[in-house]
């Protein structure tokens, strides 16, 4: 597999950017320390997460650790500007998600020059000399509307070329797209040479059909690694009320209620089922559930190895809740 990570569970850095709420600095740093103490050695972040706040906090939390002891991934496609602005920023469907982050303005830039600038900024905020894997962030419809294909064209002709060169020169280990949609990944596979993808919410217990149609089989064939972000689908599979970064609608809630009922009848924690389902596919290099509070990372690791009876998975399949093409945990 072209995405080689030290642990199959990583730490998703979005909560460090004050996602949904203003997280105190000591709590944010403690959540990273907890992840490290639990054995997690893969950390992901992005400039979008609080306009650089997540990167600053992650860098501070990891500063005392041997850089060779962990893998780090970050994202390009956005530049954090010096000027500040108030109110809701142009963040696509995630408009108010990081309203408690830093007030700096963020600008899209998927060019080769913008990619180099974004990496330089991230290295500085993270306080490190290298980033292992770089994801081109959000060249997709949920952020760019009907113009998303044009944006992806720029990204594949600019950022992808620059990152391929960096990989060849040994500056990074690999690159791919970091998106919430399957189609941009399929196009990137046809037109470029990515090492894998970070895809959020699209290979989960709740939503996996589209990924299984082409992306997952092709990734397996080419030895690419898929990092599954949002294995709890923004929290709805972990007892929360968010799906796709907003309050879940009635159709999604009804489907989750059926999943919960089946889980209860088999004495299964639905969170464990969600993590183990995503990890069961051979193309999945890691999952990165967000952990906004100390203790969550250790809990996620416990859930990922919890015993789940085969009868539960068979019941999901029989109810049509899991695709016949989806590998199930052993």
Description of each model-found segment:
Residues 1-83, 87-91:
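N-terminal binding-site loop/beta-alpha segment at the start of enzyme catalytic domains
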Residues 3-9, 39-41, 66-70, 128-132, ...:
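Short, well-ordered coil/turn segments that N-cap beta-strands
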Residues 11, 28, 43, 58, ...:
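Conserved, mostly hydrophobic/aromatic
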Residues 14-26, 100-116, 148:
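Active-site mouth loops of central-metabolism enzymes
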Residues 22-35, 111-125, 180-187:
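Short, acidic/polar
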Residues 27, 139-330:
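Beta/alpha (TIM)-barrel catalytic core signal, keyed to glycine-rich beta->alpha loops juxtaposed to Asp/Glu
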Residues 85-132:
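Active-site gating/metal-coordination segments in enzymes
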Residues 123-147:
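Active-site groove signature of glycoside hydrolases
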């Amino acid at each position: 597999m072209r995405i080689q990570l030290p642990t199959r569970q990583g730490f998703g850095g979005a909560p460090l950017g004050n996602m949904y709420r203003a997280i105190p600095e000591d709590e944010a740093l403690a959540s990273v320390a907890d992840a490290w103490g639990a054995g997690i050695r893969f950390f992901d972040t992005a400039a979008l997460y609080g306009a650089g706040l997540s990167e600053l906090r992650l860098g501070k939390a990891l500063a005392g650790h041997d850089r060779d002891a962990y893998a780090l991934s970050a994202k390009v496609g956005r530049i954090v500007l010096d000027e500040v602005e108030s109110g809701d920023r142009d963040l696509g469907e995630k408009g108010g998600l990081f309203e408690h982050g830093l007030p700096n303005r963020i600008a899209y830039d998927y060019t080769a020059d913008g990619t180099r600038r974004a990496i330089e900024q991230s290295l500085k905020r993270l306080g490190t000399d290298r980033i292992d894997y770089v994801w081109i962030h959000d060249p997709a419809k949920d952020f760019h509307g009907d113009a998303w294909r044009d944006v992806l064209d720029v990204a594949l002709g600019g950022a992808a070329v620059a990152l391929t060169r960096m990989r060849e020169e040994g500056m990074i280990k690999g690159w791919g797209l970091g998106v919430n949609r399957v189609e941009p990944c399929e196009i990137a596979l046809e037109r470029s040479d990515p090492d894998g993808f970070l895809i959020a919410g699209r290979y989960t217990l709740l939503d996996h059909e589209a990924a299984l149609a082409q992306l997952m089989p092709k990734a397996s064939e080419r030895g690419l690694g898929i990092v599954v972000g949002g294995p709890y689908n923004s929290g709805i599979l972990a007892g929360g009320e968010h799906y796709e970064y907003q309050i879940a609608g009635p159709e999604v809630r009804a489907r989750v209620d059926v999943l919960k009922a089946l889980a209860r009848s088999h004495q299964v924690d639905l969170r464990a089922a969600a993590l183990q389902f995503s990890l069961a596919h051979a193309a999945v290099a890691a999952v990165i559930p967000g952990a906004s509070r100390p203790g969550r990372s250790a809990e996620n690791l416990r859930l990922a190895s919890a015993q789940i009876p085969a009868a539960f998975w068979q019941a999901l399949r029989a109810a049509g809740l899991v695709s016949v093409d989806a590998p199930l945990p052993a």
